[in-house]
Amino acid sequence: MEQTYQYAWIIPFLPLPVPMLIGLGLFLFPTATKSLRRMWAFQSVLLLSIVMIFSMNLSIQQINSSSAYQYVWSWIINNDVSLEFGYLIDPLTSIMSILITTVGILVLIYSDNYMSHDHGYLRFFVYMSFFSTSMLGLVTSSNLIQIYIFWELVGICSYLLIGFWFTRPVAAKACQKAFVTNRVGDFGLLLGILGFYWITGSFEFRNLFQIFNNLISNNEVNFLFVTLCAVLLFAGAIAKSAQFPLHVWLPDAMEGPTPISALIHAATMVAAGIFLVARLLPLFIVIPHIMNFISLIGIITVFLGATLALAQKDIKRGLAYSTMSQLGYMMLALGMGSYRSALFHLITHAYSKALLFLGSGSVIHSMETLVGYCPKKSQNMVLMGGLTKHVPITKTSFLLGTLSLCGIPPLACFWSKDEILNDSWLYSPIFAIIAWSTAGLTAFYMCRIYLLTFEGHLNVHFQNYSGKKNTPFYSISLWGKEGSKISNKNFSLITLLKMKKDGRPSFFSNKVYKIDENVRNMIQPFLSIPHFGNTKTYSYPYESDNTMLFPILILVLFTLFVGFLGIPFNQDGVDLDILSKWLTPSINLLHKNSNNSIDWYEFCKDAVFSVSISSFGIFIAFFLYKPVYSSFQNLDLINSFVKMGPKRIFSDKIKKVIYDWSYNRGYIDAFYETFLTVGMRNLAKFAHFFDRRIIDGMPNGVGLMSFFVAEVIKSVGGGRISSYLFFYFSYVSIFLLIYYFLNF
């Protein structure tokens, strides 16, 4: 066992040869490297698979022995400064390593087909491998300096991947927004690291925790300064994990390729903030009020993310706000001191969200058959619907991921979210009410995404956005408002999206959406794609092929069974709670005397309420978004609920307020644009003016004045001796007069 730990330092570096060799190959043998590009995808998967096997071996040893191993090398040693580098293998490291490698491998396999038409294929796999290296280095770091180095590398990789299609202006702006927003948190993290080093004199975790606990117990620190340093450390996690108020970069990050979205939202960038708080939890616990602040940020993010997801039309942005809300649950659990629940939800959410993003990528991939490469169309749920018969495997997989995130048993997220919800009652009834209400909202907006995408009819083939044919029945539109009636039957709303030059309306354009050499050129109306032994020609959305479906099906298995990893049942002496063994010793401020095991009756009693709330949210979503003609064609049921009147008008106003809040991102982006972005730009313009006109103006003015004076003197002198003698005697006379009057 000791020998296995000794070679654990290689974990972060195993994926690194791929980007290095690709770069070397493109420099020395560009043609051969590009022609054999599929080989590099295999190499990436192979090396990351080796890391996964290594991590699983370490995890088994962690479960059996509950031990931690740390190895450090001294780099700088003197009387004042001691800087060490090394690696730390403990339960948190092993959990994160397995999470990163399993999701990373599946995303790489998926990307091989998804990015096959892209000219940036090799560049994509370079970024992905370097991303895996950075994240693995982060989770194995043994001190704050290493954390910060790999933290910045993760940020760089996310910047490169979000702006992968950098020739699209919206993608370029998105990666800049992510980079600048994370700079705020990263600067706070750096200041917090330096502050705690100034207090304790150590960057290494174990020494830092021990020294700081001694200082706190002896009351030898300034609590105001310590709290400030802790808040600065937490600011890094706020930005990285898209917590309020630094969450604004996350939905814009959807401009990158869909596999990147899956990796960022499941196991890398956004998970880094949760990992940092979990790693530093022994430090935060002993600082008054900081845990309350963490839980407050978490509960605000939980509710805000859910409300902002309610009216999103872009399928990836809807999932992005879902990620934001679920990360809020994890942060809430950490703030409550429920360490096990937070990590449990991190695991279950990672696989469920990866499944949803890869499923959405499959849907987008199939929609491009009809609308070409145009994210505003291929990702727009308004134009989807009725995909069940076209992409049945993707539909079933997406449904399982949706139900998991809704908290429906026995799927993965049910077990972890239910644990957090139950713990919230012990911490704060107010927080519990918000958390439980948000569970219902989660079920509503996730079911809404599913229904708009897969149920009904394919809306690009019909006359309006409500997903129905012309019927006399009342229609429920995208937001659940009354569908407007169009008197001219020959006019269709969908024709407003595309008009040909001859004036005739047409949704399908012959134009190829090509963006230099960085995006796929796909708008063929008919594609021949082999999948599962069938070769057909499609004029409708088609099911993805094997290399995209295989990772989705594996993630379905994880979504079905990974929740059983942490089932807290203890019956007849059989302890099924593997996660608690894995995390021993674990921090739990809410159950200090508990062994994390409950009986079936107690568990069912606690679970019934959460499942009821989720079921209510699902029912409301079905009531509003299930196609009217398929559910109530023979019963004019909807009209009985929506007759106009004072109550109806008031409810419409309430829905409009909620819709505007959600669709406009809570006006937070507009607030930042008005008061921060515009203000900073005006300040930069003033600084530029002051620097050029005032700071540079003074020496330039002196030089210019000297030049003109010299020119005047030059013109007056003219090189004649009489002129020189005249000026000489004039200056002497003036000097003598001044001297005379001063001494008079």
Swiss-Prot record:
Keywords: Chloroplast, Membrane, NAD, NADP, Plastid, Plastoquinone, Quinone, Thylakoid, Translocase, Transmembrane, Transmembrane helix, Transport
GO cellular component: chloroplast thylakoid membrane
Main subcellular location of this protein, as a coarse class: plastid
Listed name of the protein: NAD(P)H-quinone oxidoreductase subunit 5, chloroplastic
Domain of life (superkingdom): Eukaryota
A GO term for molecular function: NADH dehydrogenase (ubiquinone) activity
EC number: 7.1.1.-
Gene label: ndhF
Membrane topology designation: Multi-pass membrane protein
Subunit: NDH is composed of at least 16 different subunits, 5 of which are encoded in the nucleus.
Similarity remark: Belongs to the complex I subunit 5 family.
Protein localization: Plastid, Chloroplast thylakoid membrane
Membrane-crossing residue ranges in chain numbering: 9-29, 40-60, 89-109, 125-145, 147-167, 185-205, 219-239, 258-278, 290-312, 327-347, 354-374, 396-416, 425-445, 549-569, 608-628, 724-744
Signal peptide span: none
Catalytic activity field: a plastoquinone + NADH + (n+1) H(+)(in) = a plastoquinol + NAD(+) + n H(+)(out); a plastoquinone + NADPH + (n+1) H(+)(in) = a plastoquinol + NADP(+) + n H(+)(out)
Pfam families noted in UniProt: Proton_antipo_C (PF01010), Proton_antipo_M (PF00361), Proton_antipo_N (PF00662)
InterPro entries xrefs: NADH_UbQ_OxRdtase_chlpt_su5_C, NADHpl_OxRdtase_5_subgr, ND/Mrp_TM, NU5C-like, Proton_antipo_N
Record's function text: NDH shuttles electrons from NAD(P)H:plastoquinone, via FMN and iron-sulfur (Fe-S) centers, to quinones in the photosynthetic chain and possibly in a chloroplast respiratory chain. The immediate electron acceptor for the enzyme in this species is believed to be plastoquinone. Couples the redox reaction to proton translocation, and thus conserves the redox energy in a proton gradient.
Single GO biological process annotation from the record: ATP synthesis coupled electron transport
